[in-house]
Amino acid sequence: MAVPKRKKSKSRRNMHRSHHAIKPKNIVVCATTGEFMLPHNIAVDNSYKGKRVFIKQKAE
């Protein structure tokens, strides 16, 4: 089993963990509705980049 030869100092331990922080989500404003949304996702009104993606059909 692998065992460290020497104790890792607090400084080295913390430097190793420096990239483990939780980063905030990237939130953008929708061009058509003005609401907040995640980038590269369909907006609430079913639009993407200003174009309608899904159009609801009326039930007969």
Curated annotation (Swiss-Prot):
Stretches for region Disordered: 1-23
Specify the signal sequence span: none
Q: Which domain of life is it from?
A: Bacteria
Q: Tell me the GO BP annotations in alphabetical order.
A: translation
Matching entries from Pfam families are given as: Ribosomal_L32p
A Gene Ontology term for the protein's cellular component: large ribosomal subunit
- Molecular function terms from GO: structural constituent of ribosome
Enumerate the UniProt keywords alphabetically.
Answer: Ribonucleoprotein, Ribosomal protein
- Give the UniProt family note: Belongs to the bacterial ribosomal protein bL32 family.
Q: Sorted alphabetically, which HAMAP family does this protein's record hold?
A: Ribosomal_bL32 (MF_00340)
- The protein's name is Large ribosomal subunit protein bL32
What is the species of this protein?
Wolbachia pipientis subsp. Culex pipiens (strain wPip)
Q: Which gene encodes it?
A: rpmF
